[in-house]
């Protein structure tokens, strides 16, 4: 499961890295503690213009066939995205990339759960594989655009903390994923050698704590740094 992450790279830099037009105006501020049901940035692909765009979607996919917006999914298991009722249509037609600079998981210990930040060794941003969909309110006729983060088997690093991890796509697969050219075969664990996991402050437990202090080193004696 992936239920919390951060995005601290600004939109202008994301545009340079991921090849989409720079937005005329900044859309969302950076965040150190992104939680479900919040608006997030996602990169989508327009098959008509063959261009990428940066858009704001709500984290928690509401299926297009849902009677209301109460049912939503924050994660989609990679193994079932082509069979689970909510995901086949977006899997085939509505894929996205979700920029991040790190994600958080909690490791169970005798002393309680210890939060970890899992990130790239070089501190660079990366993208989760995602799906998006549109749901129309039957009363107001307004459209709600939502998204989900795909999860899969953990790599050796994350397996020490949790049984699953978000699917991180390497750069050479971005175009294949967005265009729909690939299947589930590219949804693999990201290489362990490129990542680190470090214990951080328990302030991260509350989504309202959204500042750099949530990344301060945590209980090293109990947790230890995972490399």
Predicted features along the sequence, with ranges:
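Short linear sequence motif anchored by a di-proline
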Residues: 1-227
